[in-house]
Amino acid sequence: QKNNTRYSAMKICTITCQNADNYGARLQCFALAYWLKKEGNEVEVIDYQPDYMREPNLWYIPSSVKELVKLFVRFPERLCSVKRHKIYSEFSKKYIPLTKVYNNINELRNDPPIADIYLAGSDQIWNPTFRNGTDPAYYLDFGPENVQRKSFSASFAVSSIENIQKKLWIKNNLKRFDKITVREQSALKILKEMGYDGELQDDPVFMLSAEEWNRALNLEESWKKLGIKNEKYVLIYDFFLSDEIKSVALEYGKQNNCKIFSVCHKSLSYADKNFVYADPVDFVNLIKHACCVISNSFHGTCFAMIYNVSYVIV
């Protein structure tokens, strides 16, 4: 892909799914803000936290005996989710320049952040299978009309939008954009079907070199805290806990005489070490030092490429 987008000496507010609890969401958000600031801009990330993307509640009032049983059965899992959310949030507070919290589109419309440019992206902000895909906030439906509105490496995360009603809604809401850049060729096709011209734009994580990532996240110091010493390992980052990744990992570990480390949201029984509570900095470090990354994650693959680590996409 290519990068045709240049920004300098502007006040820019970006909006993305920065509150999602996964490594890619937080790291691409950080990378875009970091790069824009490096280009000489004043940058803030809109801290948009709609109800569907909020911190998981540890407790809630069950409406039936069935719900009560479900609450207790899933309590350990919910506890893990709350702990992970705290870890992700601490990363964002330390590394990402956030605005005040906005809980819904009305709050954004009533008190929009001041900026020269509103920038939507990156990541799956327009994914029509998720609620954010038809949330007006991610289509910049707020703020003064004279503010420039652009997207940066936005993704629909699908090859086509089959739901006609959603497709029409998205088409109408893209009208307010002055420029649209997207992450995938498939997104260009979707835009063309809607009558829009778009450009390909690399994901923000590629805007930083490996050396810049090392410095920006202080990786050398953080690596020491993980306590991994001279261990050869293949790293598993598996969104779906798939049997296919398991078989590939076991075979790779056997053939290459290396351990299996996991950085998934749940422990894997076949892994030698599980880093369930790794923060985004640990995630980058674990990829950087791996002999191979086996994943079904876009950003897992991206960081393997950045650090020139072998990878297998499953």
Walk through the language-model features, giving the residues of each.
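Short, Lys/Arg-enriched N-terminal segments with co-localized hydrophobic residues
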Residues: Q1-A9
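Aromatic- and Gly/Pro-rich donor/ligand-binding loops
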Residues: T16-Y23, L27-N172, L219-S222
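Hydrophobic/aromatic ligand-binding patch that stacks against planar heteroaromatic rings
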Residues: W35, I190, Y252, L286, ...
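An anion/phosphate-binding loop that grips the pyrophosphate of nucleotide cofactors and donors
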Residues: A115, F177, A290
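Active-site donor-nucleotide binding/catalytic segment of nucleotide-sugar enzymes
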Residues: L119-K166, Y196, L200-K273
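A conserved, positively charged/aromatic
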Residues: K171-R176, I287
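A short beta-strand/loop micro-motif in the catalytic core of glycosyltransferases
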Residues: F177-E184, I294
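A donor-sugar binding/catalytic signature common to diverse glycosyltransferases
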Residues: P280, L286-V314
